[in-house]
Amino acid sequence: PAVWGYCMWRKYHDGIADTELISGRELLRREPNFNEKTRFAISNPDSGCVCPYGLTIAYAENAVQNGARIALNTAVLGMDVADGRITAVHTNRGTLHPALVINAAGVFAEDVARMADDRFFSIHPRRGTNSILDRKAGAFMHSIASVKGNDMVSKTHSKGGGILHTVHDNLLIGPDAVETYEKENTATYPESIAHVFSKQKITMPALTERDIITYFTGVRAPTFEEDFIIERGRHTHNLIHVAGIQSPGLTTAPAV
C-alpha cells in the first residue's frame, strides 16, 4: 500500500503521467542485473538523459545567437543601489549600469542579494561526488535508477543519487550529499566514493569501483527551505532572484 500510494502521489499530485508500478519480476526482465531481491519498482518509461555539459554549451551558444554577450573571467565586486533600484554593478573589468539584474549566482546568490540590499535567504553549500565508469559497465543497465526507502520518502527532498546510463554509454554513479562551509570545495574524497557505491550496490550488486575511469565533485546551492527561489526582489525592484535551484537545474532550465 505504501509503495502504491507513493506511486499515485507522483502520478497525480506531481503530474508525472507515465508513472507506473511494476513487479520485481518485470523489473528484472527489463534490467537483468538489478538486485534480484527487489519486490517493486516505480517506472517512468518516458524519462531520459542528455549530455549536461553539451546542453549547457548549446544554451550559451543559443543565447549569443539571440544577442547575449558572455563576459568570462568577470567577477561582481559590488553594487550601487538607490531608491530601490540597482544603478551600477562594479566588476573587476569595469562598471555596468543595468536595467535589470538576474541573480543566478549559485552558491554566491546570497552574496549578490546582499550587495543588492535584498537578502532574505541563506545558502548552505552541499557537496556531491559522482563517479564515471568504463563503457563496459554501461552494458549492465540501460536506464536511470535509484533506490528510495520508506524513510527517504518522508525525510528527504531528493532522490538521493542514483545510477545513470549516459549518452556516451558509460555509467554515472552518484552523487552523495555532504554539507560544507566552503562554497568552492570541489575536492573528491575516498569516503564519498565508497558511500555512493555502497548505496547504489543495493540496486545493482555487480557495480565495482575497479570500473571507475574518473570522478568529480560539485557544490549545490540549497536554501534552508530546500526549494527554488524564483521571484522579484522584495526591496530592490530591478532584480530577479533565481536561487536555491540545486541538482534539478539542468532539467528545469527550460521551465525556469
What do these predicted ranges mean?
Residues 42-100:
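Helical element adjacent to the flavin cofactor pocket in flavoenzyme catalytic cores
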Residues 79-174, 178-189, 195-198, 204-207:
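Flavin-dependent oxidoreductases
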